Amino acid sequence: MNIIETTNEAMTSEPTPIVRSYSGRKEITTINLNVTQNTDGEYQCQTLSISHDGRLSASDIIKIISGKGLFGHIGVAFLKCLVSLFAIPDYDTLAAVLVSGRYTYPEELSCHRKALLGDMQPLTELNAYVEQCKVLAAQCFDNADTPNNENKNENENE
């Protein structure tokens, strides 16, 4: 897998968050993050170009972004594109995909085991990251799909 990171400046139209193209047996995935518009109406963004054999999954893309230290630059437009391209069905699935960008299931279990043995720091870090992922995922789906708002909606019906 070959990954090239660049900063694009002075684009006249807003870049598409995720672009996939194919050449022979290779997939080239271009990810545009941190899109901003200047006063002249031109766009700037961080771009990751990934060339690889086969196809990347949504989790693979999030892992690459996290590995490059760009997780904080993920925005709603990017997530909506990810949801559309990979047919992510709901809030819970998207939140899980986002969490998997940084933690594997065994790593999550390890955080819980350490907490049981008295070391709360890894679990505190995991929980903070999960909350961040939940907030991002909630931006792509109706508020009624999020766990915090389910209880609020049930109480309104009473």
Where are these predicted regions, by residue range?
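A preference for well-ordered globular domain cores
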Residues: 1-158
